[in-house]
Amino acid sequence: MLTRRTLFPLVAGGLLAPRIARADLAGIEAAARKEGAITWYTAHTDGESAQIVADAFTQRYPEIKVTLIRTTAQVAYQRLLQDLKNGIAQCDVFSSTDLGHDEALRADGKFAKYAPENAKDLLPAFQGLDPAGTYYPTLSELVVPIYNTAKVKPADAPKSWPDLLDPKWRNQVAVGHPAYSGTVGTWVVAMRKLYGWEYFEKLEANRPLIGRSVNDAVGVLNSGERIVAAGPIGLSQVTAARGNPVGLVYPSDGAVLIVSPSAIMANAPHPNAARLFEEFLLGPTHARLSAEGYRLPVRAGTPVQPGAKPVDEIKVNRLTTAEIVQGIPEVIEQWRDTFGS
């Protein structure tokens, strides 16, 4: 039964790792080329960035067509659950921003066990995320305060998370929704841990504009519809680099780290292409593309973009998997009680 509350004791206590399939890259690649296709359900990044990744994979392996299904984490998860309920094998690789999804699917046997060759090059902070060897971190991101640089001076921009609660930002704040976005859900759990639910009761008094994805905040800042927000460093910096009025602050009380895994479905219709794609997501090309998108590399030896801060220079709040598994369902209900949606 895919319930997150019953998962918590398993996550907290850990599980013995069963035998994991090891990578035979030459054989996998040959078989993947024969399969010729892969379907990727992903909540990682925005749609444009996800398409860049899919195109890079196809450029390297022209025989393999990538069908990209990009949406928010909760929507992708519900679609996958519906597939499973109906006996439909469509998704090959599942990439969520909510670790609770990965834990639930792993515990229910929906993920294949696989040990990617490229997993050995993960940074130490990202090693061993799943001792059972089914999902691996393929992307990381930070959520920080962002602002419209045409309407807010740097000196006046929020310097910490409680600064978003200042009454001067009433009707000027934008956030995503934890019932749609795993990134937003993780951020909400982190804020509750730091400041209690009172943080969101005070935020509600500022009448925020609530989107779905964490990326929505960047769009409404860029348009000037709102002028401060909780947003992702990646899309924020890409948008700013294109000459748009989006700035960010590394908050004094810590950016929120989002660790986003990918896993191969046990019923993947293209299992070898899925393994090859998982290797690609953990490999140097995807690491470079992630860094070019101003996201945090999970692979060792990947340089950050000029002007971007390396993670060891940033104060970071990182939740445990158990905190995310237990916390996101709780804050979704609290959010609906407070914000009415």
Language-model features: locations:
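N-terminal secretory signal peptides and thylakoid transit peptides that target proteins
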Residues: M1-A12
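Extracellular/periplasmic bilobal clamshell ligand-binding domains
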Residues: P306-S341
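Periplasmic-binding protein-like
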Residues: E141, W169-A179, E201-E204, I210-G211, R242-A268, F280-V304, ...
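A bilobed periplasmic-binding-protein/Venus flytrap-type ligand-binding module shared by bacterial periplasmic
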Residues: I146-K151, V188-V189, I258-A273, L289-S290
